[in-house]
Amino acid sequence: SVPGPMGPSGPRGLPGPPGPGPQGFQGPPGEPGEPGSGPMGPRGPPGPPGKNGDDGEAGKPGRPGERGPPGPQGARGLPGTAGLPGMKGHRGFSGLDGAKGDAGPAGPKGEPGSPGENGAPGQMGPRGPGERGRPGASGPAGARGNDGATGAAGPPGPTGPAGPPGFPGAVGAKGEAGPQGARGSEGPQGVRGEPGPPGPAGAAGPAGNPGADGQPGAKGANGAPGIAGAPGFPGARGPSGPQGPSGPPGPKGNSGEPGAPGSKGDTGAKGEPGPTGIQGPPGPAGEEGKRGARGEPGPTGLPGPPGERGGPGSRGFPGADGVAGPKGPAGERGSPGPAGPKGSPGEAGRPGEAGLPGAKGLTGSPGSPGPDGKTGPPGPAGQDGRPGPPGPPGARGQAGVMGFPGPKGAAGEPGKAGERGVPGPPGAVGPAGKDGEAGAQGPPGPAGPAGERGEQGPAGSPGFQGLPGPAGPPGEAGKPGEQGVPGDLGAPGPSGARGERGFPGERGVQGPPGPAGPRGSNGAPGSQGAPGLQGMPGERGAAGLPGPKGDRGDAGPKGADGAPGKDGVRGLTGPIGPPGPAGAPGDKGESGPSGPAGPTGARGAPGDRGEPGPPGPAGFAGPPGADGQPGAKGEPGDAGAKGDAGPPGPAGPTGPPGPIGNLGAPGPKGARGSAGPPGATGFPGAAGRVGPPGPSGNAGPPGPPGPVGKEGGKGPRGETGPAGRPGEVGPPGPPGPSGEKGSPGADGPAGAPGTPGPQGISGQRGVVGLPGQRGERGFPGLPGPSGEPGKQGPSGSSGERGPPGPMGPPGLAGPPGESGREGPGAEGSPGRDGSPGPKGDRGETGPGPPGAPGAPGAPGPVGPAGKSGDRGETGPAGPAGPAGPAGARGPAGPQGPRGDKGETGEQGDRGIKGHRGFSGLQGPAGPPGSPGEQGPSGASGPAGPRGPPGSAGSPGKDGLNGLPGPIGPPGPRGRTGDAGPVGPPGPPGPPGPPGPP
């Protein structure tokens, strides 16, 4: 059959998991390529600032260290092995026959027909419209595996419920058509029930009026399958009877033999590449490559100017590494030279003495860019180059997020009392004091005389509605009322609508025969009646004995060509026959359509180095690749020497507070990511027009397998082709595994000081963290030594007023201070009278004997309130009494109104310097202040003296795989493969069904 046109390519799905195939062998190391030079990628976004830690002590500025040796070039990862072919999906179950529709309304009952002969078995009805199952998630398209033996087709199972649509699978290469499974044998057809006995033909009555349409009859139950009768002789083909109800499914047929492998279908046209799918999970990490040969040392860079010395930053959580910028375009690679013969390894010579640095050569004119060389095999990893001069220190990092307050320290021991200070100058007279607290309630006074009754007050406002009262008890049931008088007969109602016709009732039992009537008179002769119905065919007689075989008759004339018979049911697949004898090698077939792209082969040995071609035009800069996933944080390197302190930059303006972000807990250290899958194919070039598919040729007889061809000799070396157009910048490759740590190189010559770098941009404002819980109080620390007095620092900007802190515990009572001198302030206004004080002690008795106690007098009337006397002059201050014990702290009184601000007093004399107190315990962290924006970078200081070379830092851990790059341009179309060997002959097909007579 002619294959239909290939449909459009589906969307690219998720890449499948790596196949369990074995790891491929590592190819031979190639020659080292020319070092590429690309523009520096953009700076990644800054990571989240870390938590502020305690300020460390400022160390003495050290000399700037030399730039450490560059890390070894990682070996190129091994190409991932092609995954095993995905398992062939099992053939979906055939949908069950659709449910039988409800029976239509029963028509008027016709005359009973004569029972027909058993007709020939009807054709198999069309497959019912079973619910089509949704396609499941497509598995990953792996490389085509060997065709397995086709399993026997099982019986059709029930159609399961449609699952949710899965994610679209990746569109793999079009696989070859697998062998067609054998069709399972159909179950036996259910036995058709025998027709019931015909009823007696009644006399044909006069044709009546057509009756009304009957109600739809109830759906009859499916009859039980009748017992299979003995097969009768085929009778005359009667009219097809109505289709009976579907019988129960037959028993499961025997599994068919494996089907013969189908012929290979024509290769469809290559579909357009689908969109780039989501990156799949990283494959397993390849084996660590061998250490490459030592590369040539790179050119010595110029030492950058030392940057400003940053203030001691607070140590916080390490911020997440910024996303790596896109890799610059790779430099053009020269054509590889011819590989020389491999020499025997020589003995390692002693390193020679370092020569004097040569004079700096003149700057040559830039050469024209060479043509794009073919990508050679990956070169071996170079050894560590000489360490370059130290680069300029980075700009000062952004302020970290305010950290959570530390744990509450333990209560410290109270400090020693300080020395008594020199009395200060007299303060100004303060404002009038607040009202004193009410004194204790005095004893009850004598009862006064009864007052006169006052006038009646005004009427009060109406009260609010009361709440509903509780529910009362249930009342007693009343007596039944007397029966009422019957009412008048109502008017007749309208006639109702005619009801629907009811279902026919069951047939009643036949009644007893009535008495015989009188014999009627003979009627007039009637007209000739209508012809009677055709009688029922008689029952088929028993089969007679077979007669003697007659003589063979003469051959009759050739009949007309019969109609083509219907396709017979596919027979069971026969067993595979033995391979036929080896035939002569067939002629070479015509070039077939290009086959699907095969899996990527192992990298071949490096070819001979071609002659350099003419320089091609410079290509345009490609678009930056997609940002890769952030790599894992490398292990911290050795601390370098501290640089000289630069001049402090001006303070930046305070920015608005940023939103408060939740500080996430540091995640667990991720496992080492495996090498990612190779990048997807690039954007397709201008596709040629696809010609119409030619007619499919008839499959020829399978020939014997041809002899194995000999390996051809090496072809002549091809001429160097013209320079190709510059390719687009490819995606950044996955980072290779870190190589072994190389030995530190020799010190390079000191370079000239570089120009000062550009002023950095102000960083983004950090996120203010939430204040943490108050920690427990720590143990008191040992008193530290008395430090030298610090220099007067610049006055800081006044901060915003913080929230009032919690009230502390009452302090110990201090020694009473000396009374100050009277200030020059004006006399304050007299205060209000205080509450009466407690009753004083009884005075001493005077001379004379005590008199007899008098009788208690009647209580006198309450006298008028006395006038308050003039305020006396303030007496001299008495000597300070001894300090009494600290009383218990009373309850906090209500906060009074804020008093007026008093006049500023004269500045007191400076007291003597007290001894330095003990170092206090660290208090709980205050609320986080809003961090200021990063100030502009200060001017670069002069280059410091060259410091000793620092130790090489430990190589960082492998970064995570980057996102897959954009799809590259399609590769050249592969040449048409030679015709393969002819396969063994297939098994003979099953015999077809006999045609119609």
UniProtKB/Swiss-Prot annotation:
Expressed in bones. The modification 5-hydroxylysine is found at residues 88, 252, 327, 558, 669, 839, 901, 913. Residues 1-997 are annotated as: Disordered. InterPro entries: Collagen (IPR008160), Collagen_superfamily (IPR050149). Belongs to the fibrillar collagen family. Residues 307-316 have a biased composition (Gly residues). This is Collagen alpha-1(I) chain. The lineage of its organism: Eukaryota, Metazoa, Chordata, Craniata, Vertebrata. Type I collagen is a member of group I collagen (fibrillar forming collagen). It comes from Neocnus comes. Trimers of one alpha 2(I) and two alpha 1(I) chains. Glycans are attached at residues 88, 913. Residues 52-66, 898-912 have a biased composition (Basic and acidic residues). Keywords: Extinct organism protein, Extracellular matrix, Glycoprotein, Hydroxylation, Phosphoprotein, Secreted. These protein fragments were extracted from an ancient bone collected in Haiti. One of its GO terms (cellular component) is extracellular space. It holds the Pfam family Collagen.
